[in-house]
Regions:
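Conserved "repeat-terminator" motif of extracellular CCP/Sushi domains
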Residues: 1-5, 9-13
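Structured extracytoplasmic
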Residues: 3, 15-181, 187-196
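A generic alpha-helix preference that emphasizes hydrophobic side chains
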Residues: 6-8, 27, 204
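Extended serine/threonine-enriched, polar tracts that run as long, contiguous segments within proteins
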Residues: 189-191, 199-208
Length: 217
């Protein structure tokens, strides 16, 4: 297993062992308790939902920024950031943020969302673009074994078959919201499969997912 640090982003490569791997021990605990975690455990629920949809221009390097077509517009590159998942630079060109009150009833499989706030930047707040982008996105349950994007089924990193599809590395542990959590990195065992790469934080007692970052490989 090799590690390379890029702007505080640790990139893992190489196959990990399926034996004596503490990350897999934690993953099995997640499987055991996943029906006790997530929204499906409740008949009815209420929550506040924050949604951020973003279009980015990827791989912004120094040669790109020095291109003469950007002369006089160098200020736009102050927004360049680095992905925590891939370690690559990107420039946000469209962002829509929204805040909702969500009311769900699992007994009748119905969800109602009430928009409380909305903010759009880029493309002059073009509503046609926003509608197109939102059509590309859906709500996902990360505990599901498979997640569908663009009519293709991707294996979830939390899937019971994930152990055969992903490498898992226990990278860190820390307090999140006063709860001790483990940080696990995942990446594909093989190329050219419908998979993700990223990391997640999981509670050390309930084994509920606190936070997850994913990018399609």
């Amino acid at each position: 297993k090799e590690m390379q640090e890029l702007n505080e982003v640790v990139v893992f490569t190489g196959k990990t062992s399926k034996k004596n791997n503490p990350a897999l021990d934690i993953l099995r605990k997640i499987w055991e308790r996943k029906r006790k975690n997530g929204l499906y455990q409740f008949n009815q629920y209420q929550m506040e939902k924050y949604e951020k949809i973003e279009f980015d221009m990827n791989t912004i390097d120094s040669a790109f920024m020095k291109n003469k077509i950007f002369k006089g517009m160098e200020f736009i590159f102050k927004q360049v950031d680095t992905s925590k998942v891939t370690g690559k630079t990107y420039l946000p060109i469209f962002i829509n943020e929204a805040l909702y009150d969500v009311y769900g009833d699992n007994t009748i499989k119905k969800v109602k969302e009430i928009n409380k706030a909305n903010k759009t930047s880029g493309f002059n707040g073009n509503q046609q673009i926003l509608a197109f982008v939102k059509d590309l996105y859906s709500d996902y349950n990360i505990y599901d074994n498979h997640l569908t994007f663009f009519d293709k089924s991707f294996t979830s990193p939390l899937s019971r078959t994930g152990i055969d599809v992903y490498n898992y590395v226990l990278r860190d542990s820390a307090l999140i919201d006063n709860k001790w959590c483990f940080n696990i990195v995942f990446y594909p065992r093989r190329k050219n499969e419908l998979t993700f790469k990223g990391d997640f934080w999981v509670n050390d007692t309930t084994f509920a997912i606190k936070k997850i970052n994913m990018a399609v490989t």
